Amino acid sequence: MAKRDYYEVLGVGKNASDDEIKKAYRKLAMKYHPDRNPDSKEAEDKFKEAKEAYEMLSDAEKKAAYDQYGHAGVDPNMAGGFGAGGAGFGGGFAEAFGDIFGDIFGQAQGQGGRRGGGPQMYRGADLRYSMEITLEQAAHGYDTQIRVPHWDECDHCHGKGAEPGSSVETCPTCHGAGQVRVSQGFFTMQQTCPKCHGSGKYIPKPCTKCHGQGKLKSQKTLEVKIPAGIDEGMRIRSSGNGEPGINGGPPGDLYVEIHIKQHAVFERDGDDLHCQMPISFATAAIGGDIEVPTLGGRASFTVPEGTQAGKTFRLRGKGIKGVRSGYAGDLYVHINIETPVKLTEHQKDLLKQFDKSVHEGGSRHSPQEQSWLDKVKNFFSS
């Protein structure tokens, strides 16, 4: 099958800059990399095609030959061809991605590893700890302790991983390098040694207590300081308290993820608080002083006369002091007018008399009701 034009493969024009060619290749390689598409032959073919195109167009000499003669100028089976070569991940692939690709697909670059001979070092995995706290603790701050998984040196083999009296040998597969070269088609790549898993060592007789790991799992107590104003989903990082590194690599970090319990009175919206405040019909009509709950205690508030159901009042600075802004939010009080229940006959008579007197006053006492009645009349008369 005829090869596609290299510029077409990468989706760039013939006047594309080196940077544009590199960006286009990175995008395609990320999309079709075998680690992301383990069972897709089509993705594997597209990955190889993009890699070949990049290797040609990123090399000035090969690019010039391709621009002048097309595939004939670079095909090793044709006279004068340069050939795709066998650069593998050490050539165009590594050049284009550096440690970015290593972070995604677990290569040593960018993870505390080192290139060249010898076992590869890997950064330990990060740990996540989910912690649930109250709204009050989130608002005011909170010091606590947590217990997290921890690894201690095995007291039987003293961290060697081998049964006492036995030795640790150089891995016969990778000869201590920690990696092996694997050929795939026209290029090769390095992979972690399947026998020693990157350590470069082989333990014929593993420790019977730690099973060759050289460490034992335990629990560790950590002090955690929850800052005032922390919000739902925020994370606190504890550096170096994640999983231990491999082959001398640095440990990962511990992330404490905060979840806030539902509160009986308040709902939080960022640094603001909302609460529903039931008041009596009489207080809504003639006004009065009420006590409003806040996280700092009770606050007095005067309800103006004629307050309608659903009215919202804002109490400035009665919310939560933001962990980032440093300023306190506001408290929004939503008024709910409570309808009295289980009335006595005397109370019912009084309300009927009151209702009659209100209606005799016309729209002066019930402007919203009168406005609604006018709209209804207009609807039926139209």
UniProtKB/Swiss-Prot annotation:
One GO cellular component assignment for this chain's record is: cytoplasm
Task: Look up keyword Transmembrane and say if it applies.
Answer: no
Note the segments forming the CXXCXGXG motif repeats: 154-161, 171-178, 193-200, 207-214
- Position of the signal peptide: none
- Give the UniProt subcellular location, in the record's own words: Cytoplasm
Task: Give UniProt keywords alphabetically.
Answer: Chaperone, Cytoplasm, DNA replication, Metal-binding, Repeat, Stress response, Zinc, Zinc-finger
Please give the Gene Ontology molecular function terms for this protein. ATP binding; heat shock protein binding; unfolded protein binding; zinc ion binding
Q: Which cofactor does it need?
A: Zn(2+)
Give the CR-type zinc finger regions. 141-219
- Quaternary structure? Homodimer.
Protein family membership: Belongs to the DnaJ family.
Domain statement: The J domain is necessary and sufficient to stimulate DnaK ATPase activity. Zinc center 1 plays an important role in the autonomous, DnaK-independent chaperone activity of DnaJ. Zinc center 2 is essential for interaction with DnaK and for DnaJ activity.
Q: What is this protein identified as?
A: Chaperone protein DnaJ
Upper lineage ranks? Bacteria, Pseudomonadati, Pseudomonadota, Betaproteobacteria, Burkholderiales
